[in-house]
Swiss-Prot record:
PANTHER family: 50S RIBOSOMAL PROTEIN L21, LARGE RIBOSOMAL SUBUNIT PROTEIN BL21M. Transmembrane segments: none annotated. This is Large ribosomal subunit protein bL21. PROSITE patterns: RIBOSOMAL_L21 (PS01169). GO terms for molecular function: rRNA binding; structural constituent of ribosome. Part of the 50S ribosomal subunit. Contacts protein L20. GO terms for biological process: translation. GO terms for cellular component: cytoplasm; ribonucleoprotein complex; ribosome. This protein binds to 23S rRNA in the presence of protein L20. The keyword Kinase does not apply. It holds the Pfam family Ribosomal_L21p.
Length: 102
């Protein structure tokens, strides 16, 4: 069985036992997270939401909280010798999908 969930403005296809790297979610390591924005549930029967599947949810456990790799943002103005270099590390959460309720 699999599901398509929406979190952090992105959509992810998940199955039970998968590890999922998402935008930062509130909670400590070991806490349980309920993802209620389920767009589709597949398996023996396929249920497609309009836009969400009613009474469907995905339960996950927070495995790790941390930051992604650094990305560099470089801005310059042509012919002005004006340059700006910034670094950014996005906060992220790693979940282990435990159960899909459909």
């Amino acid at each position: 069985m699999y599901a398509v969930v929406r979190t952090g403005g992105k959509q992810y296809k998940v199955s039970e036992g998968d590890f999922l790297k998402v935008e930062k979610l509130e909670g400590a390591v070991g806490d349980t997270v309920n993802l209620s924005e389920v767009l589709m549930v597949g398996g023996d029967k396929v249920a497609i939401g309009t836009p969400l599947v009613p009474s469907a949810s995905v339960v996950g456990k927070i495995v790790e909280q941390g930051k992604d790799k650094k990305i560099l943002v470089f801005k310059s103005k042509r012919r002005k010798d004006s340059r700006k270099l910034n670094g950014h590390r996005q906060l992220r959460t790693i979940l282990k999908i435990e159960k899909i309720n459909a």
